[in-house]
Regions:
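Retroelement reverse transcriptase polymerase core
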Residues: 8, 16-241
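Intrinsically disordered, low-complexity charged segments
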Residues: 1-15
């Protein structure tokens, strides 16, 4: 019996709270009875505007609350990564996503380049691209933020015994935090072909210490709720009821 693995995750039902053209997809437990399912769906449809479904719906956090800094350790000099080639069909999709990020105010054309990283892409399940940056060189030069992070095993214990657990993911949550203006130029990245070079105005996912910066901000915002009504691990939230 040692090789028998217990299935612990509930079966999930995918539901669309939006339209066929503008989908707003979430998931509910497959263990709900018909009455519970109807109540949950009524609640979700009524309050769906409480959630952000796309970049323009996100609001930035105040710089007075949090900014992400990019300090550089002594002995490290700016580094420019060599350019990479990409297929033409991928380049066209990258251009679309770059334009979307510019419209959202997340990135802007790079004006002063010291550090220069390459862009890499990830194809999501829906066929769209996620823009990622190879920040390995500047990450090596950045000192570690020793902010204490939650312990996952303890969080599991803290949510046990509750009847309903609601799981939420911070949609592009890192992108709600500004990069300190003096450090923005260090995030410069190169796109393929003639798309150009850009820099991040907000905090991207692949920067060292981004998780610590986000956790610090969330602990400050939800300090009177964490432990009582919710638990949080970086951008993953569990509401207990």
């Amino acid at each position: 019996m040692d090789d028998v693995k217990e299935k612990v995750q509930d079966p999930l039902i995918e539901v669309n709270l939006g339209t066929k053209e503008d989908q707003q997809v979430t998931f509910v437990s497959g263990h709900l009875g018909p009455e519970e399912f109807d109540k949950i769906m009524t609640f979700l449809r009524r309050d769906k505007n409480c959630f952000a479904w796309d970049y323009p719906e996100l609001s930035e956090l105040s710089r007075k609350l949090v900014e992400h800094r990019l300090l550089i350790k002594k002995g490290f000099l700016p580094f420019q990564q060599a350019p990479r080639r990409m297929a033409t069909n991928i380049t066209l999709k990258i251009k679309e996503e770059i334009e979307r990020l510019v419209r959202a105010g997340f990135i802007r054309p790079a004006r002063y380049i010291e550090w220069l990283s390459n862009m890499v892409h990830v194809v999501k399940k829906n066929g769209k691209l996620r823009i990622c940056i190879d920040f390995r060189n500047i990450n090596m030069a950045t000192p570690k933020d020793e902010y204490p992070m939650p312990v996952a095993d303890l969080l599991v214990d803290d949510v046990s015994g509750y009847k309903v657990l609601s799981f939420m993911d911070g949609h592009a949550g890192y992108n709600q935090i500004f990069i300190a203006e003096s450090d923005v130029h260090k995030t410069a990245f190169r796109c393929p072909s003639s798309i150009g070079t850009f820099e991040w105005v907000v905090m991207p996912f692949s920067l060292k210490n981004a998780g610590a910066t986000y956790q610090r901000a969330m602990n400050s915002i939800f300090h009177d709720m964490i432990g009582k009504y919710m638990e949080m691990y970086i951008d993953d939230i569990v509401v207990k009821s």
